[in-house]
Amino acid sequence: MKSVITTVVAAADAAGRFPSTSDLESVQGSIQRAAARLEAAEKLAANLDAVAKEAYDAAIKKYSYLNNAGEANSTDTFKAKCLRDIKHYLRLINYSLVVGGTGPLDEWGIAGQREVYRTLGLPTAPYVEALSFARNRGCSPRDLSAQALTEYNSLLDYVINSLS
């Protein structure tokens, strides 16, 4: 799994050197942000179902045509799969918060996602809308500390950009 620490060590090892001062500063910054990431991960884990449902509802409200016969959200099975996918992305964001890097997202969520959706004829815009809603709904200090919200939002942005 890729994290800041494993990335720094792997890069130094590949170059046949010890980690540089800037490498170690990067690791130190990641460690200093760990408490905020864990706060965000804990809140997300506790509220995953509610966050996913609100995000799903916002996406379907914007893209209501998807409920029409023959569209991507026209059956209960399709609706359940869409909600499942949103939960999957949020769970991977949770894992990424814990490890302090994008490894879980890169390995289990982003690699090949657009091709899969295109092959299945699924639009990515509703997923972008759902994740954007989750990002825009977060509020400091109501939901999370400012730093925890920043960590959470940066990973949401990472996924949104990969789907866009």
UniProtKB/Swiss-Prot annotation:
Q: How does it sit in the membrane?
A: Peripheral membrane protein
Residues binding (2R,3E)-phycoerythrobilin 1 are: 82
Q: In which broad location class does this protein mainly occur, judging by the first location in its UniProt entry?
A: membrane
Would I find Membrane among this entry's keywords? Answer: yes
The reply to whether Nuclease figures as a keyword in the UniProt entry is: no
Please provide one cellular component term from the Gene Ontology annotations of this protein: plasma membrane-derived thylakoid membrane
Question: Subunit details for this protein?
Answer: Heterodimer of an alpha and a beta chain.
| Full protein name | C-phycoerythrin alpha chain
**What is the species of this protein?**
Synechocystis sp. (strain PCC 6701)
